[in-house]
Amino acid sequence: MEATQFQTMLEERGILLSSRALAQFERYYELLVEWNEKMNLTAITDKPGVYVKHFFDSVSPAFYYDFSAPLALCDVGSGAGFPSLPLKICFPHLRVSIVDSLQKRIRFLEHLITELGLADVALYHERAETFARQKGMRESFDVVTARAVARMPVLVELCLPLVKMGGTFIAMKAASALEELKEGNKAISVLGGEVTATETFTLPFDEGERTIIFIQKMRKTPNQYPRKPGTPNKQPIQ
């Protein structure tokens, strides 16, 4: 997939990219490959692969969810900025917060957002378990996203505490997600969420199946969650 194909395929989904946005995606690709030589950001470095498996995949929640409002979005464990920064490029009015536990990735993201000229992007070098307990962060985001971070019972404990009442947690998963979702049902309920939709689609050029799970925050998350760092992984709610 080249940039023009990417633009056309997003247009078919109702997402129109400006010339500035196209240039930002091009620069994003260049910086990703450049910095990947110094640190492990991605195993995918060929241009068609990055455009399909990172950029197109990251924007895919917008095929099913309305990002046209000035939403506050938190991306947990975004790595090289996925999915939040491709979404930010497409929807510049989003207010984005990125939480990642590795300082070297934060350094890359700092450079990236400066180079791309992205405003209203805040970076936090934190564990999600700690970040979600901070006053002003807990239950304060309209949308929380996570892409390939952890299995559902763990992921829900890291992310749902950050979602405001009535807001949405968007979990981006591979093809096996529906089986995984069953494992996470108890955690979703305990943490105050309710699954409102699951959407499955195939990436362009048959590059793999993806499932996006939308969970709405219906009740406040009990104060004991998230538990201390490492506990959700070792003892998931099941």
UniProtKB/Swiss-Prot annotation:
Its main location: cytoplasm. S-adenosyl-L-methionine binds at residues 77, 82, 128-129, 147. The keyword Cytoplasm applies. It is found in: Cytoplasm. One of its GO terms (cellular component) is cytosol. Its EC number is 2.1.1.-. Keywords: Cytoplasm, Methyltransferase, rRNA processing, S-adenosyl-L-methionine, Transferase. It comes from the Bacteria. It holds the Pfam family GidB. InterPro entries: rRNA_ssu_MeTfrase_G, SAM-dependent_MTases_sf. One of its GO terms (molecular function) is rRNA (guanine-N7-)-methyltransferase activity. The keyword Oxidoreductase does not apply. Specifically methylates the N7 position of guanine in position 535 of 16S rRNA. NCBIfam families: rsmG_gidB (TIGR00138). Belongs to the methyltransferase superfamily. RNA methyltransferase RsmG family. This is Ribosomal RNA small subunit methyltransferase G. The lineage of its organism: Bacteria, Bacillati, Bacillota, Bacilli, Bacillales.
